[in-house]
């Protein structure tokens, strides 16, 4: 590597294509992650979302379907993230599906909160999490917007979820 003037140190990367070079700062920014924790009100359904790379803003989609409108559902996801869901008492989790029945809302039967929604697509579990269930996150980082999916066909809906929802999901029922 040639060093002249004030050039930054570079790192070579290989990602299945031709090698390319990035500055050290750009490489670190890309791999830096943010851990977001959340849970239902009583803590029976808890999650840890590793968001990579760490976002300047977090998209928060206020779904306009009848269920989310009545429940105040505002969801986020990062397809590059990793989600771990831990359920303390699975007997206190109710899963609700409606409409196309392609998603399950995980409702805590003790406190009534819906911290996650999952969708099983091609034998793979995808998820979104409720921003209202976040613990300790600065709410000014949320970029809120409405999201309406009425009239969306099932094939389009599942393709959108595969693109946009969290694909790395671990769901653990720990029991009591």
Positions of PLM-derived features:
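Coiled-coil-like amphipathic alpha-helices with heptad-repeat character
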Residues: 1-4, 10, 156-158
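Residue-identity detector for glycine
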Residues: 5, 16-17, 25
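A short Gly-Trp-Pro
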Residues: 23-39, 44-176
């Amino acid at each position: 590597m040639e060093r002249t003037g004030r050039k930054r140190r570079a790192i070579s990367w290989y990602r299945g294509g031709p090698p390319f070079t990035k500055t050290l700062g750009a490489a670190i920014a890309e791999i830096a992650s943010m851990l977001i924790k959340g849970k239902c009100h009583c803590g029976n359904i808890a999650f840890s979302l590793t968001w990579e790379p760490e976002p300047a803003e977090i998209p928060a989609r206020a779904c306009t379907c009848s269920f989310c409108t009545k429940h105040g559902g505002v969801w986020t996801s990062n397809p590059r993230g990793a989600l771990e869901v831990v359920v303390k008492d699975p007997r206190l989790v109710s899963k609700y599906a409606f409409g196309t029945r392609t998603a399950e809302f995980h409702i805590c039967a003790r406190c009534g909160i819906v911290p996650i929604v999952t969708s099983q697509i091609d034998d793979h579990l995808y998820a979104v999490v409720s921003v209202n269930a976040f613990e300790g996150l600065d709410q000014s980082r949320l970029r809120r917007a409405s999201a309406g999916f009425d009239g969306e066909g099932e094939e389009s809906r599942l393709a959108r979820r595969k693109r946009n929802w969290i694909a790395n999901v671990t769901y653990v029922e720990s029991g009591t």
